[in-house]
């Protein structure tokens, strides 16, 4: 699970950087810049889909990682488990801020 999480995170960072190169955050042209990415940028639609679906896959891998920890009783290691919970909360907050 950890290697899949790392791969998903790397894909998210790379696709996010490529999308940020063409995105305009001005309120009057934000939608037009997304349409520009999908229509005019080479494989822009694919990069956008990888970025959107990669986020879902990232969280599925996180939940599977947590489920494995619950199954094997890793919650008994309190320090490690608490750090994992903090990382999960930080990841969820970052995803929310990135979505908004």
From Swiss-Prot:
Residues binding heme b b566, per UniProt: 65
Cofactor, how bound (note): Binds 2 heme b groups non-covalently.
Record-annotated membrane-spanning stretches: 1-21, 45-66, 81-100
Compartments reported by the entry: Mitochondrion inner membrane
GO molecular function: metal ion binding; ubiquinol-cytochrome-c reductase activity
InterPro entries cross-referenced by the UniProt entry: Cyt_b/b6_N (IPR005797), Cytb/b6-like_sf (IPR027387), Di-haem_cyt_TM (IPR016174)
A Pfam family matched in the record: Cytochrome_B
Residues annotated as binding heme b b562: 51
GO BP of this protein: mitochondrial electron transport, ubiquinol to cytochrome c
Keyword entries, A-Z: Electron transport, Heme, Iron, Membrane, Metal-binding, Mitochondrion, Mitochondrion inner membrane, Respiratory chain, Transmembrane, Transmembrane helix, Transport, Ubiquinone
Coiled-coil intervals: none
One cellular-component annotation, GO: mitochondrial inner membrane
PROSITE patterns reported in the protein's UniProt record: CYTB_NTER
Recorded family membership: Belongs to the cytochrome b family.
Stated role: Component of the ubiquinol-cytochrome c reductase complex (complex III or cytochrome b-c1 complex) that is part of the mitochondrial respiratory chain. The b-c1 complex mediates electron transfer from ubiquinol to cytochrome c. Contributes to the generation of a proton gradient across the mitochondrial membrane that is then used for ATP synthesis.
Other comment: Heme 1 (or BL or b562) is low-potential and absorbs at about 562 nm, and heme 2 (or BH or b566) is high-potential and absorbs at about 566 nm.
Subunit and partners: The cytochrome bc1 complex contains 3 respiratory subunits (MT-CYB, CYC1 and UQCRFS1), 2 core proteins (UQCRC1 and UQCRC2) and probably 6 low-molecular weight proteins.
Protein name as annotated: Cytochrome b
Source species of the chain: Polypterus sp. (Bichir)
Lineage, highest ranks first: Eukaryota, Metazoa, Chordata, Craniata, Vertebrata
